A protein has these predicted regions:
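Conserved AAA+ ATPase core "coupling" helix
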Residues: 248-308
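Conserved alpha-helical scaffold flanking the Walker A/P-loop in AAA+ ATPase domains
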Residues: 123-124, 177-197
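Walker A/P-loop
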Residues: 127-162
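AAA+/P-loop NTPase substrate/partner-engagement loops
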Residues: 152-178
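C-terminal engagement/docking regions of AAA+ P-loop ATPases
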Residues: 330-410
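AAA+/SF3 P-loop NTPase mechanochemical coupling elements
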Residues: 185-194, 223-240, 251-260, 264, ...
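Conserved AAA+/SF3 P-loop NTPase catalytic/coupling segment centered on the Walker-B
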Residues: 193-217, 246-256, 267-275
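Pre-Walker A (pre-P-loop) alpha-helix and adjacent loop at the N terminus of AAA/AAA+ ATPase modules
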Residues: 95-132, 137
Length: 410
């Protein structure tokens, strides 16, 4: 992932469209809605006036200038970060979706520290009816995160530990003969939940992986010709270990494509790790803390309602062409042996809509697409043999690709 630039960046000065008040914002907010502190009028940040140079904080997050031309794209830092503070910085209005998003992240933060990409990416996938693949070393709190998320959302949580001898029926369930009724009765498997943690999914063979394909795409299980619907919302969070390769199986492309995002859980920062130690310094059972400290802030009905509302977020025709151009370039970009499928474009559009709703907007912008591009594409492309030999990373190639695409003026 790109680090924020440490060099100074100019601020942009423009006038409020209602009262004429001079407003000054970072260049990164060009094209976004800004609320005037004097009259509360919402005005689109415009480049009509020249920016006034000012030293920027080295920690300021860089975002794509939505009015940039092709030449300027070469020198811009495109934000591929999903950070909680960026959601607050770019918020346009206090909409019901944004209010709920803030409540959920606040409650999760009571027990789960850091990992902004994991938290935001999972919530975007949940409210887009998608699924998440998490690449992470052991011990970073994935199970705690899923349990906390289930508590906050008020939906049941299930966990499957994938092993080499795990059978499809161990996931989906199977018919069992009932001695009392002398009939076969379907015994549901652990997949019949709403928040499923598929731990170390790459330790099972392809036969077991195939059992998840229908579940993830159709939200149902078919046993002996009879379909059993899963309760909605339904979210699969699958994990794989990037270090240990012995005894693992590569996930087939068909299954990788079913995951909306591939998120990277990394080691926490120094301050975050210190906070983790403080949280666990009290010898209190985790179940007790979940019960007493974390509150349920939503319901199944509200989740489904907001998911439906997010599908109505406006996507301009120029933004559709922008998404299409990014996806199509992955198929011809040097360093990629296999590019992304049309399903990647659908995921980018759906994710951009949901992220825009989290920002409090009723329309999507190129920044929304840029921030979810890496999680959407990194597992859908395959490096060429030459790129692997040279040690070039997927994220590096994708970042260069995204920078090469002209950002539309909306």
């Amino acid at each position: 992932m790109n680090e924020p630039p440490s060099s100074s960046t100019p601020n942009l000065t423009f006038n409020c469209g209602k009262c004429g008040e001079a407003l000054q914002v970072p260049q990164s907010l060009v094209g976004t809605d800004v609320s005037c502190p004097k009259c509360q009028q919402v005005t689109v940040a415009s480049t009509a006036q020249s920016p006034i140079p000012q030293t920027a904080d080295a920690n300021t997050t860089a975002f794509t200038d939505v009015t940039a031309n092709t030449d300027e794209n070469q020198s811009l830092e495109i934000s591929t970060r999903l950070e909680l503070n960026s959601v607050d910085a770019l918020s346009a209005a206090e909409t019901p979706t944004k209010i709920l998003f803030n409540k959920i992240t606040t409650e999760i933060g009571k027990l789960f520290v850091g990992q902004d990409e994991l938290v935001i990416g999972t919530l975007v996938a949940l409210f887009s009816s998608g699924h998440v693949l998490i690449e992470s070393v052991p011990g970073l709190g994935k199970t705690l995160f899923v349990r906390t998320l289930g508590r906050v959302l008020g939906i049941p949580f299930g966990r499957i530990q994938f092993t080499a001898d795990l059978m499809p029926s161990d996931i989906t369930g199977a018919p069992m003969f009932d001695m009392k009724t002398q009939e076969f009765r379907f015994r549901p498997g652990p997949v019949f939940t709403q928040l499923l943690l598929a731990d170390e999914i790459n330790r099972s063979p392809a036969k077991t992986h195939a059992a998840l394909l229908e579940i993830m795409q159709e939200f149902r299980v078919t046993i002996d010709g009879k379909s059993h619907a899963l309760d909605r919302p339904f979210l699969v969070l699958a994990t794989q270990n990037p270090i240990e390769s012995e005894g693992t199986y590569n996930l087939p492309e068909a299954q990788l494509d079913r995951f909306m995002f591939k998120l990277m859980a990394t080691y926490p920062e120094k301050d975050e790790e210190a906070n983790i130690l403080r949280l666990h310094s009290e010898q209190t059972d985790i179940n007790e803390r979940l019960e007493n400290e974390v509150q349920t802030v939503t319901s199944v009905a509200e989740i489904l309602s907001i998911t439906q509302e997010n599908s109505k977020i406006r996507v301009d025709e120029k933004l559709i062409n922008y998404i299409n151009e990014i996806v199509r370039k992955t198929r011809e970009w040097p360093g990629f042996h296999l590019g992304a499928s049309p399903r990647a474009g659908i995921a980018l559009m759906q994710g951009a809509r949901t992220l825009a709703a989290f920002y409090g907007r009723d329309y999507a912008v190129p920044d929304d697409v840029a921030q979810i591009s890496l999680p959407t594409l990194r597992h859908r492309v395959i490096l060429s043999a030459e790129a692997e030999v040279e040690g070039i990373g997927v994220d590096d190639l994708l970042t260069d690709l995204i920078r090469s695409v002209e950002v539309p003026r909306l």
